[in-house]
């Protein structure tokens, strides 16, 4: 009775202290929050006593996305510090870890990091805002896999130490949370989910433990999160409810902070009353890979098969039983498996007998003639209809028709074919007789059989004959005799000049000096070619009124109609020539393109080795280039003006920075060509700390320093770094890269020599397309500060942008190529330009090598030596006010050495220094902090713009 009273008092106290998120309607304070209702929690004083001797492993997970501003982030830290106040923190009581997340997860400290509450509080105060994305699921996964591992300080599960996650978030996650949160809860982790502002309530419920009214909380803003402190003190410090209440759990009672939940044994699930348990039907939700039947068992399942099937060795698939495998069961023909037994089957054309095993041939015509007009005949597998002699089967395969032998056999009768009962014969038309071959016909010759009386010709007709006259004669009235015909008597038949009778007809004649035209009637003047060749190169041929020129065989007439040229034998076919087919007389020869020679077969072509066959005169190396060659120089040399001899670059100092476009329009294959281009330039320089210093930037949507001017002291190391350079492959922010180069790459911190040394500063900017930002501002600043700018563009590079980048004169500092095949020529010209710059500098050597010069501040460049660490340490007030800057964790090794050497040197640095200097340093620090803040704000705005731009490009 006493336990029940205590439990009721505790639960009553919670009802007054906490108003958690719940699906049921409860009285709640409401206020506007963009159209949503958010629950207000009352401010309740903390309990006087802490959670003494309370053993727990507690991990805070804090949303550090960009949507959380600086003020709200400070409120979250205050909330954590308030929670820590009532916890008994120590290795044997409560252990505390903390993660914060954005696009990635940052482990601020693990469960084993700190042993005292003061250490945890100090770490919370030093946390820095990540200000990136919202990967909530990733943070929970990290806590499950790493933060609660024994290696990170979590106590073993066998010790039954509660594992608790307290997660604070203010927005919709960018990844999935439900599955990973459920997995964490199933391992025994208790999750409190706290939402601030416009958080989706369903998302919070997917994260938090059940019942949601005890583990899911929602407040309007970060200022109200402190109202939850007392709620969590009650939940984290309460006694075990299972021991003081009549819980009525059917199987197990599990304590939760301030409450309890019922759990079931393996193979059972909790009923809707949240107390009783029922057997879990594992087959109800999925078949578990069972091919046919899934049968539920207590805590498990088995796969079973239908009748006629057996379970395979994998326990899931089913195989049909082969009843005919061992014997044919007396079947005469075939044994066939049925669903749960077997049956006998006969071959085609046979039927199964009554014993269901033997077979008999089928008599298809016994019961019916199947509609056959003449005869029904049994075949192998069916009945066929057959016709009597002299008949053939119709397309219906049943009725018959008389055979048309004349149509079927095509006997070749010249006139007519006549069918008979069993065959056919040929017959001739009237006036014809059948020839002995029985097929062809001959006309009856009436003229040969009787005396017809015809004077000249007798002509057979269909049934008799007629007399006819020879050509040039006409039949007389007796129809037998003939008289010569006068064709010109009645008409001149269209003759232009005169009509003359001939033996058989007439002919037109022309006067002297004329010839008859092809129409046989009109006349033309005599042959035009007889008077001259009329300029015809080969032959002149007269036409009706004039002439035409013709060419000999193998030639064709040109457009002038007079001269001739040889036929193009290569026009329609190349005759197997690999490169070119060229006409040669009346034949052809094969020829090759420049840079190639003809092979022995006279058709294929082989590349010429011009360097091998020519006295090229190259001092170092000869390289074939089509039908010509190029001279190249060894490492450290450049080509002289004659294009053949080589000269060494002056080994003077130079600070050279490559700015390389790594955008996706370039492509990985061309990026390799650019890397060869860079190493070629490096080969022409005497790389050392005192001579040539080289740095390299790669850019796309961001700028990446591959190595600085002080990165390498030898060409070998530098070329190796270029070879291993990774392709970025995104946008093209050339202006951003020029800004980075101007502000950072040529600073003494990154290895540049100060302007006072007058060491030439050279930048080689390579790009293959239009920049996505402005290049003119930073290109102008770089040139104004003495940096010689070379612009190299390939492909789609914009000439106007290249001109804005390049130094004057443009023709010496701008190089453009349509493709990457001419990069070698550009490389040689660049080497010459760089060598000229070295020669103009007079071969000066930089004695400072890699050390930073200890000189006065140069007004033209914001070098980091303007204010040194030892100057800061000399100002005691500044050092005390900003002691965080000089703690061990925040100083580099070099700064620590300087600090200790200053203290041990015995110099009067503290009070003897000029106080004005200290005040100036503090003023500078304030101004610098303000500038850093402005730059940070601009960087955030630029980052947002870049992300929006990348998203637009992604979905184009």
Swiss-Prot record:
The lineage of its organism: Eukaryota, Metazoa, Chordata, Craniata, Vertebrata. Disulfide bonds join 242-253, 249-262, 264-277, 283-294, 290-303, 305-318, 324-335, 331-344, 346-359, 365-376, 372-385, 387-400, 406-417, 413-426, 428-441, 447-458, 454-467, 469-482, 488-499, 495-508, 510-523, 529-540, 536-549, 551-564, 570-581, 577-590, 592-605, 611-622, 618-631, 633-646. Detected in a variety of organs, including calvaria, uterus, heart and brain, as well as fibroblast and osteoblast cell lines. Residues 917-955 form a coiled coil. SUPFAM superfamilies: Chicken cartilage matrix protein (SSF58002), Growth factor receptor domain (SSF57184), vWA-like (SSF53300). Residues 238-278, 279-319, 320-360, 361-401, 402-442, 443-483, 484-524, 525-565, 566-606, 607-647 form the EGF-like domain. It comes from Mus musculus. This is Matrilin-2. It is found in: Secreted. CDD domains: vWA_Matrilin.
């Amino acid at each position: 009775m006493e336990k029940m009273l205590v439990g009721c008092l505790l639960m009553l106290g919670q009802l007054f202290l906490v108003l958690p998120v719940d699906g049921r309607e409860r009285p709640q304070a409401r206020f506007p929050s963009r159209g949503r209702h958010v629950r207000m929690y009352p401010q309740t004083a903390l309990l006087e006593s802490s959670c003494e001797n309370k053993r727990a492993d507690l991990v805070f997970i804090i949303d550090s996305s960009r949507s959380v501003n600086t003020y709200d982030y400070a409120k979250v830290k205050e909330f954590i510090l308030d929670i820590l106040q009532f916890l008994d923190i120590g290795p044997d009581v409560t252990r505390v870890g903390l993660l914060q997340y954005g696009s990635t997860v940052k482990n601020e400290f693990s469960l084993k990091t700190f042993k005292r509450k003061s250490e945890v509080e100090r770490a919370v105060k030093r946390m820095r805002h990540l200000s990136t994305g919202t990967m909530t699921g990733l943070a929970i996964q990290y806590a499950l896999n790493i933060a609660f591992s024994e290696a990170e300080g979590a106590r073993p599960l066998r010790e039954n130490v509660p594992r608790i996650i307290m997660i604070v978030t203010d927005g919709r996650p960018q990844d999935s949370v439900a599955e990973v949160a459920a997995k964490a809860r199933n391992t025994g982790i208790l999750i409190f989910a706290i939402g601030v502002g416009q958080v989706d309530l369903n998302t919070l419920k997917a994260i938090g433990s059940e019942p949601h009214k005890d583990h899911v909380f929602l407040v309007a803003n970060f200022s109200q999160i402190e109202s939850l402190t007392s709620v969590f003190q009650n939940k984290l410090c309460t006694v075990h409810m299972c021991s003081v209440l009549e819980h009525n759990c059917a199987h197990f009672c599990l304590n939760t902070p301030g409450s309890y939940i019922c759990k079931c044994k393996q193979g059972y699930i909790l009923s809707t009353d949240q107390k009783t348990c029922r057997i879990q039907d594992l087959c109800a939700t999925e078949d578990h890979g069972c091919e046919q039947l899934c049968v539920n068992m207590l805590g498990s399942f088995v796969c079973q098969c239908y009748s006629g099937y057996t379970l395979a060795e994998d326990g899931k698939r089913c195989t049909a039983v082969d009843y005919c495998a061992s014997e044919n069961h007396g079947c005469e023909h075939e044994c066939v498996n049925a669903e749960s037994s077997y049956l006998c089957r006969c071959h085609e054309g046979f039927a199964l007998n009554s014993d269901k095993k033997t077979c008999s041939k089928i008599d298809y015509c016994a019961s019916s003639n199947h509609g056959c007009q003449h005869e029904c005949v049994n075949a192998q597998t069916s009945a066929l209809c057959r016709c009597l002699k002299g008949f053939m089967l119709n397309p219906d395969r049943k009725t018959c028709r008389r055979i048309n032998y004349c149509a079927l056999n095509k006997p070749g009768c010249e006139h007519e074919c006549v069918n008979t009962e069993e065959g056919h014969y040929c017959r001739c038309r009237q006036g014809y007789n059948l020839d002995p071959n029985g097929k062809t016909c001959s006309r009856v010759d009436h003229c040969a059989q009787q005396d017809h009386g015809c004077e000249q010709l007798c002509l057979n007709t269909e049934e008799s004959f007629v007399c006819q006259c020879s050509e040039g004669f006409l039949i007389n009235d007796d129809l037998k005799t003939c008289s010569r015909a006068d064709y010109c008597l009645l008409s001149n038949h269209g003759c232009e000049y005169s009509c003359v009778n001939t033996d058989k007809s007439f002919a037109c004649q022309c006067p002297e000096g004329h010839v008859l035209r092809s129409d046989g009637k009109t006349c033309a003047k005599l042959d035009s070619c007889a008077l001259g060749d009329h300029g015809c190169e080969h032959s002149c041929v007269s036409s009706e009124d004039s002439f035409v020129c013709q060419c000999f065989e193998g030639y064709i007439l040109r457009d002038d109609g007079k001269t001739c040229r040889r036929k193009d034998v290569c026009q329609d076919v190349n005759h197997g020539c690999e490169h070119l087919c060229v006409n040669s007389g009346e034949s052809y020869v094969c020829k090759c393109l420049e840079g190639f020679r003809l092979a022995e077969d006279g058709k294929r072509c082989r590349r010429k080795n011009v360097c091998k066959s020519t006295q090229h005169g190259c001092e170092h190396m000869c390289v074939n280039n089509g039908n010509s060659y190029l001279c190249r120089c060894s490492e450290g040399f450049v080509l002289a003006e004659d294009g053949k001899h080589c000269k060494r670059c002056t080994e003077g100092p130079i600070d050279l920075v490559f700015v390389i476009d790594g955008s996706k329009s370039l492509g990985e294959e061309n990026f390799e060509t650019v890397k060869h281009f860079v190493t070629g330039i490096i080969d022409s320089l005497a790389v050392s700390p005192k001579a040539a210093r080289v740095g390299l930037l790669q850019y796309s949507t961001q700028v990446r320093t591959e190595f600085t001017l002080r990165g390498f002291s030898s060409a070998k190391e530098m070329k190796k770094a270029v070879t291993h350079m990774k392709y970025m492959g995104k946008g093209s922010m050339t202006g951003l890269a020029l800004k980075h180069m101007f502000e950072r790459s040529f600073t003494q911190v990154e290895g540049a020599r100060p302007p006072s040394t007058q060491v030439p500063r050279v930048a080689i900017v390579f790009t293959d397309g239009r920049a996505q930002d402005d290049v003119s501002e930073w290109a102008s600043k770089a040139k104004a500060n003495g940096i010689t700018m070379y612009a190299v563009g390939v492909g789609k590079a914009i000439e106007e942008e290249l001109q804005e980048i390049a130094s004057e004169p443009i023709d010496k500092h701008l190089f453009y190529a349509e493709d990457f095949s001419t990069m070698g020529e550009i490389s040689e010209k660049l080497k010459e330009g760089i060598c000229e710059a070295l020669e103009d500098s007079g071969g000066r050597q930089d004695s400072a090598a890699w050390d930073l010069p200890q000189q006065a501040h140069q007004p033209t460049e914001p070098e980091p030596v303007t204010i040194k660490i030892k100057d800061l340490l000399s100002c005691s007030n500044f050092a005390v006010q900003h002691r965080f800057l000089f703690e061990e964790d925040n100083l580099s090794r070099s700064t620590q050495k300087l600090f200790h050497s200053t203290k041990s040197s015995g110099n009067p640095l503290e009070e003897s220094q000029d106080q004005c200097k200290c005040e100036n340093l503090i003023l500078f620090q304030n101004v610098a902090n303000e500038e850093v803040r402005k730059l940070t704000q601009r960087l955030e705005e630029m980052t947002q713009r870049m992300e929006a731009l990348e998203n637009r490009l992604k979905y184009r």
